[in-house]
Regions:
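Membrane-proximal helix-turn-helix segments that form the acceptor-binding/catalytic region
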Residues: 65, 90-109
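N-terminal subdomain of nucleotide-sugar transferases
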Residues: 1-41
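Conserved donor-binding/catalytic core segment of Leloir-type glycosyltransferases
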Residues: 158-168
Length: 168
């Protein structure tokens, strides 16, 4: 199976959570033996799309015309869009219509939580929506005795003092 992970607009999202999600998707697909590296759009069996930018919607339409399956990732909701910048609340109803249109271009939508699944389904998206956590890179977040020692030394913490760390 060959998968093309569409990266149009990557410069806009590469430093965001969406950019990291794209890299995680590629890593997981590779680990499962799926060919993702160097797969051209026209040669793919499946196209994965991560943004609701206009070029992504066009890519989804092109894929469907070519008979390819489309996996659309539901990273965006109207609720997240609201209050994100001055005037966003005025644009939110248009954004809702746009993302509903985009998500309906997929054969399935994958979103990171049950809450976002509920929201996306409530918009009237007609294709199946699945909640699948983005997960974390366990290789990066593994126990490291030297790192632990350096952290405690830097913050002047004894081995007996408890430390609570939050990520997310």
């Amino acid at each position: 199976m060959k998968v093309h992970v569409y990266t149009g607009g990557k410069r806009i999202v590469e430093r965001s959570g969406v950019g990291r999600a794209i890299e995680h998707q590629k890593d997981i697909l590779r680990a499962e033996g799926v060919t993702v590296d160097g797969v051209r759009f026209k040669d793919a069996d499946i196209v994965h799309i991560n943004t609701v930018l206009p070029d992504s919607a066009l890519a989804a339409m092109r894929a469907r015309i070519m008979g390819k399956k489309v996996v659309y990732y539901g990273h965006s909701t109207m609720q997240d869009f609201r209050n994100s910048f001055k005037g966003s609340n005025v644009l939110a109803p248009l954004f809702w219509r746009w993302i509903t249109f985009c998500y309906n271009l997929g054969d399935v939508v994958i979103t990171p939580s049950e809450y976002s699944k509920f929201l996306i389904e409530s918009y009237g998206v007609k294709v199946p929506v699945y909640a699948v956590s983005n997960g974390i890179d366990l290789g990066f977040w593994k126990a490291d005795k030297e790192g632990r020692r350096a952290f405690r030394e830097k913050y002047k913490l004894t081995d007996e003092e408890k430390v609570v760390i939050s990520v997310g």
